[in-house]
A protein has these predicted regions:
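Compositionally biased, charge-rich terminal segments
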Residues: 1-6, 136, 143-145
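Short hydrophobic helices that act as membrane-entry/anchoring signals
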Residues: 1-23
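Catalytic zinc-binding patch centered on the HExxH motif and its immediate surroundings
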Residues: 24-81, 89
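Short, solvent-exposed loop/turn segments at secondary-structure junctions
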Residues: 40-41, 71-74, 101, 110, ...
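Preference for well-ordered, secondary-structure-rich cores of eukaryotic proteins
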Residues: 67, 91-93, 158-163
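Post-HEXXH active-site segment of zinc metalloproteases
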Residues: 90, 106-134
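Active-site recognition of the HExxH zinc-binding catalytic motif
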Residues: 94-107
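Long, well-structured alpha-helical subdomains associated
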Residues: 125, 138-196
């Protein structure tokens, strides 16, 4: 009798563990939720860690961000609900595009390699940052053009300005890149977005 009770208790214990595991797995499979923090005018976007999604780590935080380009539009609509101020909206959108580009970089290279290159190679860090800034520029330009705050013809001038600003900024924190190489990065992103 005692043996039967012990076996029954053991089976129940195992079943409870299986149920607990299934619930945890189900929780992980849920669609990632979006969280916003708009303190000090910064728009940070957090997604719950989810399998097969890009994962990059910045400022000792885990950034888990969707890869699909359409997600920026979806997120942009949500951000638009949070602010009616146009300039603040453009800033938010640009910041989100910047971080999403870093996530794409991490996704294509693999998190570990991306992290290693970013931290140990000033050249790659500069390229990663310029690509992220180019994505930011594209998002801001598209939003400004759509809201009739900017003409498409002005994109070339914006690129020239961003290249000059980025190289001054990079020289102070990372390393400078040749102007031609920096310009190529911005133009590549603008062409891909059909802005030039």
């Amino acid at each position: 009798m005692k043996i039967k009770v012990i076996i029954l208790m053991w089976v129940l214990k195992v079943l409870l563990k299986i149920v607990k595991f299934c619930r945890m797995a189900e929780g992980k499979m849920k669609t990632p939720e979006v969280f916003y923090s708009s303190e000090s005018k910064d728009a940070y976007i957090y997604f719950v860690l989810h399998e097969h999604k890009a994962h990059a780590c910045f400022d000792k935080r885990d950034w888990t961000i969707f890869i699909d380009d359409s997600d920026l539009e979806k997120v942009g609509k949500k951000v638009r609900e949070l602010t009616t101020d146009d300039s603040e909206y453009f800033d938010y959108l640009g910041h989100l595009a910047h971080e999403m580009e870093h996530a794409k970089q991490a996704h294509s290279l693999g998190g570990e390699l991306f992290d290693k290159l970013y931290r140990k190679s000033s050249y790659y860090r500069a390229v990663f940052e310029l690509e992220a800034d180019a994505a930011c520029m594209v998002a801001e330009c598209k939003a400004r053009i759509e809201s009739k705050r900017m003409l498409k013809e002005h994109v070339h001038s914006v690129i020239d300005l961003r290249v000059a600003q980025a190289n001054r900024w990079l020289a102070g924190y990372y390393t400078s890149l040749p102007i031609k190489e920096a310009a190529r990065i911005y133009k590549r992103f603008a062409k891909k977005a059909s802005l030039i």
